[in-house]
């Protein structure tokens, strides 16, 4: 791995690029070694610029780390974790919202309830991020990501941004057919119009025995 090109990129972009960076604090098990190169882009422009200099290297995208075991030996793989600007959540219609894929599932559920949208209450029980939820088609209490997902915006490892409709994705139990050379950027969800009080009532989920 030619570290000089990464150091030049860091100097030119003042980016959040780190070397020999421990990943232990980025997963819930607090295990794993150090990434030779770790990048946390704060916006899409930074991410595109970085991807253009790393086409020949293996890459892995990190989410919330709630369902992840990291090896002590990571080799020369590059690790990418989306920054805070990829966790924005906003309304785009009376019954639709868009969430950055580094948003925590619970934050999306809370946002929907606060805005009188029903359907995403189940996300409050899923410990993870939107991106990981899409990848695994996470779900509980009879609902899954695919039930409310309209489309996702993605970027491939060559830096090309595109949108994929849910109907063009094959979802299964805790899986989907999207290739692993895609980074999920944002997701659009369609909910049911309700009101805040009713939506929060739905958060009182059945007691597990």
For the regions a protein language model found, what residue spans apply to each?
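Single conserved hydrophobic/aromatic residue that forms the stacking wall/gate
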Residues: 202-209
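Flexible, small-/acidic-enriched active-site or ligand-binding loops
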Residues: 168-177
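Short, conserved charged micro-motifs
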Residues: 46-49, 195-199
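Anion-binding (especially nucleotide phosphate/pyrophosphate-binding) glycine-rich loop
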Residues: 3-130
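Short, glycine- and charge-enriched coil/turn segments that flank and shape catalytic ligand pockets
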Residues: 56, 90-96, 158-160, 180-181, ...
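Structural signature of FAD isoalloxazine-binding scaffolds in flavoprotein oxidoreductases
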Residues: 32-33, 39-44, 69-87, 135-165, ...
């Amino acid at each position: 791995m030619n570290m000089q090109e990464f150091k030049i990129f860091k100097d030119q972009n003042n980016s959040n690029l780190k070397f020999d960076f421990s990943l232990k604090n980025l997963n819930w098990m607090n295990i794993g070694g150090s990434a030779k190169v770790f990048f946390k882009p704060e916006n899409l422009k930074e991410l595109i610029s970085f991807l253009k200099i790393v086409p020949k290297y293996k890459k892995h995208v990190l989410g919330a780390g709630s369902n992840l075991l990291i090896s002590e030996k990571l080799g020369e793989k590059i690790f990418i974790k989306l920054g805070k600007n990829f966790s924005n959540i906003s309304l785009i219609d009376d019954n639709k919202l868009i969430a950055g894929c580094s948003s925590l599932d619970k934050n999306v559920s809370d946002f929907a309830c606060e805005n009188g949208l029903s359907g995403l209450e189940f996300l409050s029980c899923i410990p993870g991020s939107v991106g990981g939820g899409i990848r695994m088609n996470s779900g509980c209490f009879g609902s899954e990501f695919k039930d409310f997902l309209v489309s996702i915006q993605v970027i491939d490892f060559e830096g090309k941004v595109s949108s994929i409709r849910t109907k063009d994705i094959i979802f299964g139990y805790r899986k989907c057919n999207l290739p692993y050379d895609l980074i999920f950027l944002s997701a659009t969800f369609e909910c049911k119009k309700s009101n805040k009080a009713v939506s929060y009532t739905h958060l009182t989920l059945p007691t597990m025995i």
